[in-house]
Structures are given as structure tokens and as C-alpha cells.
Amino acid sequence: MLPPDDRQGFGDLFKHTKSITYQVLRPFTPIAIDSYTFTPIPLLHSKPTFGYFIQTPSENIAYLTDCAGLPQESLEFLQQKSIDICYIDAGAFVDSNGKKDSSNHLSHYEAAEIIKALAPKQARLIHISHTILESLRDIPLPFPYVL
């Protein structure tokens, strides 16, 4: 699978500069919007990508999509938090020979390892394509997480 032809990175956003108010985000530096706090968390992907630790009045959420893993600093940051629910990328499929179809996304096995390390109260696997879901129907999942 080839990545999109986007040499600039988010090039389409630069065409419509008046439609969005841009704010530079820095790793682990929270921003507040009303009663919500968003902390950018660096993720491993084909280009620099952030996940987010989101604090709401009622729960703490880890939102980790478009990732092939977490840098150690990100993992350690999140392990210090009480996470109510973790949404995590599981877009790569692992075939019966153990071959992963994407180097830019986690498999459900890799996502499970991160979930175990973070110990959230709940977890949801996200960023899954219909082809992966079809294949997963025949594979008993070794963990109690929701797809």
C-alpha cells in the first residue's frame, strides 16, 4: 500500500487557510478548550503524528489513531495517567503466517500489548477496515476488547 502523494504533508489544508484557525501543538503541552484539556502525544507513523490524552469533566480518554506504536516517552506519559477509555489503532492485519500488511498501523495483537501496558478501564480498537473485520470473524480474539 502506497502512502498518499502529499510531499508537503497536509497540503490540502494550506489551500484553505481562512477556513481553519491553526494552532501549533507541542508534544505533551496541553491546550484547554472550554472544560476539556487535550494533550498531544507523539505516535510512531509514516509522518509525525499525534494522539491525544483528553481530560473531560467526567473521564480521561487516550485517543491513539494512525500509529504503528508509541515512543517510550509517550508510553511512560500515558502510564502515569488514569485512563477511563483508550481508543487505539488496530488497522494492520496479521495473516495466518504472522505477516503484517502495514508498517504504519498496529495489528490487534500489538494494540493489545499497548492496552495491557496502559491498563485503561475500557479499550476500543479503531481504524479498522472492512477487510480486517471480515478476517477477524474467523479468529478468536485473545482479549476482551471491543472492535
Regions found by a protein language model. Give the residues of each.
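Binuclear metal-dependent hydrolase catalytic cores
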Residues: 1-64, 68-76, 81, 130-147
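Cap/insert and terminal regions of metallo-dependent hydrolase folds
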Residues: 69-147
